[in-house]
């Protein structure tokens, strides 16, 4: 009989808050979301994807930059996006990214990411309400929700999107 003693590290996850990014500015439309977050996105010369987590009242809980890419693409890991939503105890989320090239039209990869994130959110019970693309150097945006391009599985959430209140308390 062996007297081997096993030592296991106990691990824990803690939410560490950084500087406040959301103010009391009321944001109800994709243009307002982009306008508010554009100051953050303007700092980058490459594609940046962020996630805005929402609570049960559809108010923002937080915002996290979950991917930084190259000039023409950002690798959006569903794991990183959903980790932010789960750790924030979010009831839903919006993803937003910029297109430094100046066009807000979604690429095939953007459409794929929207579909994957919609399915991941549905599986975890944290719905994706919108994916917004902001073109650099202009006010041009593309909202998958407003264009009716959200995946079919998300249509059951569509009635709640109009109630999203992107204003912090």
Protein language model regions, located:
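Extended substrate/RNA-proximal surfaces in nucleic-acid metabolism proteins
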Residues: 28
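Short loop/turn motifs at secondary-structure junctions and domain boundaries
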Residues: 42-45
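Active-site-proximal loop/helix of nucleotide/amide-processing enzymes and allied scaffolds
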Residues: 1-15, 19-23, 32-35, 55-57, ...
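A cross-taxonomic marker for long C-terminal extensions/tails that follow the last structured domain
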Residues: 162-169
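Short loop/turn microsegments at loop-to-beta-strand junctions
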Residues: 48-49, 129
């Amino acid at each position: 009989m062996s007297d081997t003693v096993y030592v296991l590290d106990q691990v824990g996850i803690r939410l560490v808050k950084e500087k406040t990014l959301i103010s009391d500015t009321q944001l109800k439309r994709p243009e307002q979301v982009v306008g508010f977050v554009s100051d953050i996105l303007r700092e980058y010369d490459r594609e940046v994807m962020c996630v805005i987590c929402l609570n049960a009242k559809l108010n923002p809980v937080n915002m996290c930059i979950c991917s930084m890419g190259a000039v023409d693409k950002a690798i959006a890991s569903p794991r990183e996006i959903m980790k932010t939503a789960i750790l924030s105890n979010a009831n839903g989320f919006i993803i937003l990214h910029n297109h430094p090239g100046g066009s807000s039209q979604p690429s095939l990869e953007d459409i794929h990411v929207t579909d994957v994130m919609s399915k991941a959110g549905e599986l975890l019970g944290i719905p994706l309400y919108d994916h917004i693309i902001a073109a650099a150097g202009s006010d041009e945006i593309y909202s998958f929700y407003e264009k009716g391009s959200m995946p079919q599985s998300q249509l059951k959430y569509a009635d709640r999107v109009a109630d999203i209140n992107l204003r912090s308390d």
